């Protein structure tokens, strides 16, 4: 009798593990400019916030947290696209001091309060702040 041929086994290839993408936390927004706004046409004192990306375009949907002695409020950019996609504003109560932080560990801006402005025609009134943040 003739022996049956023995099967030779080819070595099987073991797939290399696939690399999983690691998310890199992007750096937080940093304050680029803080401008006092004295405009008698604004009916109430505001904190006007602009968040821009590296190309200078507004970034919508970013949470901004404002705190004061007995309160806190969150606002979001992008709700007033007619002004700018990266724009948000908050109405200040005169003589209250606010602290602002862009979510995600951004720079803390403290001691924000309605500045006093004066206009020859309309006298004294409460001013506003314009804060422009950039994403490095």
Where are the regions a protein language model picked out?
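Short, ordered, surface-exposed loop/turn motifs in non-cytosolic proteins
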Residues: 56-73
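A short, solvent-exposed beta-strand micro-motif common in secreted/extracellular proteins
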Residues: 96-106
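Ser/Thr-rich, Proline-interspersed low-complexity disordered segments
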Residues: 1-34, 136
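Extracellular beta-sheet/turn segments enriched in Thr/Pro/Gly and aliphatic residues
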Residues: 23-40, 109-136
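A short, Gly/Thr-enriched small/hydrophobic beta-strand-prone motif that recurs across taxa
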Residues: 32-54
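Residue-level recognition of well-ordered beta-strand positions that form the cores
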Residues: 50, 65, 101-103
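Short, acidic Ser/Thr/Gly-rich low-complexity loop/linker segments typical of extracellular
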Residues: 70-94, 107-116
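Exposed beta-strand and adjacent loop surfaces of beta-rich binding modules
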Residues: 44-46, 61-63, 97-99
């Amino acid at each position: 009798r003739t022996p049956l041929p023995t099967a030779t086994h080819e070595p099987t290839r073991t797939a290399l593990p696939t690399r999983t993408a690691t998310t890199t936390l992007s750096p937080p927004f940093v304050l680029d400019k803080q401008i006092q706004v004295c405009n008698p046409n604004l009916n109430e004192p505001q904190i006007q916030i602009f968040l821009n990306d590296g190309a200078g375009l507004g970034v919508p949907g970013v949470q901004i947290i404002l705190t004061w002695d007995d309160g806190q409020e969150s606002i979001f950019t992008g709700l007033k696209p007619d002004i700018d996609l990266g724009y948000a504003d908050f109405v200040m109560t005169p003589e209250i001091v606010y602290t602002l932080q862009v979510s995600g560990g951004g720079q803390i801006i403290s001691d924000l309060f309605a500045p006093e402005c004066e206009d020859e025609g309309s006298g004294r009134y409460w001013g506003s702040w314009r804060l422009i943040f950039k994403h490095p």
